[in-house]
């Protein structure tokens, strides 16, 4: 069956899991633009501890991300997702009940330890057919960007109207809603599909970690989230010092995010169609350097701060679209799922480092010092990015080998002789082949027919 139209079950799985993932991300990110300003009223709060509270969820998520993904193969996807969301909800309740910064730190640490991203992707693979899996994954990727923008706006509005504790109560409700959706809306899976494109494989991490091109991309996503977190440690205070009250910050985030979303699409099309990924990537890193310098130089100049935020969000949103695509292109055939697992871990380590380091610098110096340190880190990243090579413009394809055809080296040789095929991995235990094909070669799409 080569039907590219999603079945009702596939559509329900896609929007159901996409909503579950978005609710969790909404809860994580709504805190980001408000904790620096409203959190200082908590007992024992300091700039350094606020930074730890912002970043601690990244540390626990980095620790549990890969183990939970592998554990879902044993205990089942749904039980792990429900358990992870329950831990997330408990962490939110602890934060909501706490009047001290240490309670917030504990709550945020628990929020991060409910790492469900890998299990969500694995369950999505179980519930969608091969020909529709890419569309389903893309839906979740798009929902992530939209969720981030919504969180930047809702966080300040809710906190101003109801307070920081109410925000955490609302996050707990979001997590509970996610549990209900997982149990009663997301379809049950009767089988686990072993798919190296979306799941992590034991024993394959050494190969992924030994790839220099992937290491540079993992360094990049770590830097990007160090810069995101450290910037949001300093930015709310800088906007307040410029005479723009915390209750109005959502207006800056809404306007700049909308412009950023509109600006990203032409760059992505240009990078893919013209095969200029490296040039656009390096341009983005350079734009972040400029953004951090503008923020550093702004001091209490409101409109200069807005310009810096705008430049940062354009580069950030573009990077969030480019980096996963580059990981997919650069990962060896059959190792994309593992490569994405390492990528996600690097991302959350960046969250932890950015929050903690940004808070420490803000406490020792000031917000300008945070932006200056960010500009220096971005300059290092720019130097690393400039050494990158143009990625191979390939698409990944998983082919289920018919039962009457042997999954062996001879089949691999035959596939490699097909026009447009660049790389092949035969997974005998799955009786499948993982193929990298030239993105513009339409003839090679016959492999899947």
Segment roles from a protein language model:
Residues 2-10, 187-218:
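Juxtamembrane intracellular "pre-TM" segments in multi-pass secondary transporters
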Residues 65-76, 263-276, 362:
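Helix-to-loop junctions at the C-terminal end of transmembrane segments
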Residues 86-99, 286-300:
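C-terminal ends and interior cores of transmembrane alpha-helices
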Residues 107-144:
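Cytoplasmic helix-loop-helix junction between adjacent transmembrane helices
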Residues 140-183:
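Helix-loop-helix hairpin linking two adjacent transmembrane segments in secondary transporters
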Residues 173-192, 381-389:
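C-terminal membrane-cytosol helix-exit motif in multi-pass small-molecule transporters
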């Amino acid at each position: 069956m080569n039907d590219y139209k999603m079945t009702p079950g596939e559509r329900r799985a896609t929007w159901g899991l996409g909503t579950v993932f978005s609710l969790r991300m909404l809860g994580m990110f709504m805190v980001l633009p408000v904790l620096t300003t409203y959190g200082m009223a908590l007992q024992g709060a300091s700039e350094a501890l606020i930074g730890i509270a912002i970043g601690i969820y990244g540390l626990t998520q980095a620790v549990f991300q890969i183990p939970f993904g592998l554990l879902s193969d044993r205990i089942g996807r749904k039980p792990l997702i429900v358990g992870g969301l329950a831990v997330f909800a408990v962490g939110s309740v602890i934060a909501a009940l706490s009047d001290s910064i240490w309670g917030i730190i504990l709550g945020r640490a628990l929020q991060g330890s409910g790492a469900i991203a890998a299990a969500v992707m694995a369950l999505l693979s179980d519930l969608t057919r091969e020909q529709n899996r890419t569309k389903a994954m893309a839906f979740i990727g798009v929902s992530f960007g939209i969720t981030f923008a919504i969180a930047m706006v809702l966080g300040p509005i809710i906190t101003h109207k109801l307070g920081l504790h109410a925000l955490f109560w609302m996050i707990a409700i979001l997590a509970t809603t996610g549990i209900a959706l997982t149990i009663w809306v997301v379809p049950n899976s009767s089988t686990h599909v072993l798919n190296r494109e979306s799941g992590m494989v034991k024993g394959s991490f050494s190969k992924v970690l030994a790839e220099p091109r992937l290491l540079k991309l993992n360094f990049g996503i770590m830097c990007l989230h160090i810069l995101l977190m450290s910037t949001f440690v300093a930015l709310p205070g800088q906007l307040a010092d410029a005479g723009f009250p915390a209750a109005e910050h959502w207006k800056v985030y809404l306007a700049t995010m909308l412009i950023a979303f509109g600006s990203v699409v032409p760059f992505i099309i240009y990078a893919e169609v013209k095969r200029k990924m490296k040039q656009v990537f390096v341009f983005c890193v350079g734009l972040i350097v400029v953004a951090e310098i503008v923020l550093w130089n702004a001091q209490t100049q409101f409109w200069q701060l807005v310009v810096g935020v705008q430049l940062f969000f354009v580069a950030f949103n573009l990077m969030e679209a480019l980096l996963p695509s580059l990981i997919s292109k650069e990962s060896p055939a059959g190792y994309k799922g593992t490569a994405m697992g390492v990528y996600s871990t690097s991302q959350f380590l960046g969250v932890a480092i950015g929050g903690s380091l940004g808070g420490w610098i803000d406490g020792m110096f000031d917000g300008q010092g945070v932006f200056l340190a960010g500009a220096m880190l971005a300059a290092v990243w720019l130097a690393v990015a400039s050494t990158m090579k143009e990625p191979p413009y390939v698409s990944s394809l998983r082919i289920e080998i018919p039962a009457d055809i042997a999954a062996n080296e001879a089949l691999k040789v035959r596939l490699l002789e097909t026009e447009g095929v660049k790389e092949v991995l035969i997974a005998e235990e799955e009786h499948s082949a993982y193929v990298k094909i030239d993105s513009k070669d339409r003839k090679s799409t016959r492999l899947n027919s």
